[in-house]
Design a protein with these regions (language model features):
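A short alpha/beta connector and helix-capping loop motif
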Residues: 14-28, 104-117, 128, 148
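Short, basic/hydrophobic alpha-helical segments
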Residues: 69-90
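RNase H-like polynucleotidyl transferase catalytic core
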Residues: 26-34, 111-140, 153-154
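A structural signal for isolated positions on well-ordered beta-strands in alpha/beta enzyme cores
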Residues: 42-44, 90-92, 124-126
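Generic structural signal for small/hydrophobic residues in well-ordered secondary structure
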Residues: 5, 43-47, 94, 136, ...
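Extended, low-complexity cationic-aromatic segments
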Residues: 1-76
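Acidic/histidine-rich, metal-coordinating catalytic segments
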Residues: 86-100, 128-131, 136
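C-terminal anion-handling pockets and recognition modules
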Residues: 121-122, 131, 135-182
Length: 182
């Protein structure tokens, strides 16, 4: 069973955290945005819950999540599952517009028909109820990850954010999915 979701990793906004200080409260400094520098990074993730073991697969996106990028991510995950000898992927995800788009739904139907004829990993899609992200077990892991990679003294580069995120979840850092994949 795999729980899929997307998250934005901000390079500027700090997650809500509590901390003790022997000095007075810290004052925020305004930092100027560099031209062409991304403020946030979009990332797809799947949490595989195999009973006692949990595994995360992450893949960053060059721009933002859209249907074509979702399909590319699904293909990438399916290739890994096929290599492991899996036959069915129970995919649990929310109702984001790029999940329920006609393009993605058509692709999943076509993929499952092709798998029925030729073999491979079938997708058994389970959508969560509308406006209920707390039902997806991957959601709390995003918050823990955001707190784990925080750097209060300086702004991280995009590469540093990606490296820290992957190190926190114990997964490999792959090339970001390009926006023009299909």
């Amino acid at each position: 069973m795999g729980y899929l979701d997307e998250v934005w990793w901000s390079r500027l906004a700090q997650p809500k955290m509590h901390a003790w200080s022997f000095q007075g409260p810290l004052r925020l400094r305004q930092k100027k945005k560099q031209k062409g520098e991304k403020q946030a990074l979009a990332c797809y993730g799947v949490l595989f819950d195999e009973g006692t073991s949990k595994q995360m697969l992450l893949r960053f996106v060059e721009r933002r999540p859209i249907s074509a990028v979702t399909i590319a991510f699904l293909e990438w995950v399916l290739a890994g599952l096929a290599a492991e000898g899996k036959r069915v992927w129970v995919l649990v995800w929310d109702n984001a517009s790029w999940h329920i788009s006609k393009k993605v739904r058509r692709w999943i139907r076509a993929h499952n028909r092709r798998v029925k004829r030729e073999g491979g990993v079938r997708i058994l899609e389970c959508r969560l109820p509308v406006q209920s992200p707390w039902l997806n077990p991957i959601e709390p892991t995003w918050l823990h990850g955001k707190r784990a990679i925080v750097e209060p003294s300086r702004k991280l580069t995009a590469q540093e954010v990606m490296e820290r995120v992957c190190a926190h979840y114990g997964c490999a850092l792959w090339e970001p999915i390009p926006q023009d994949v299909l």
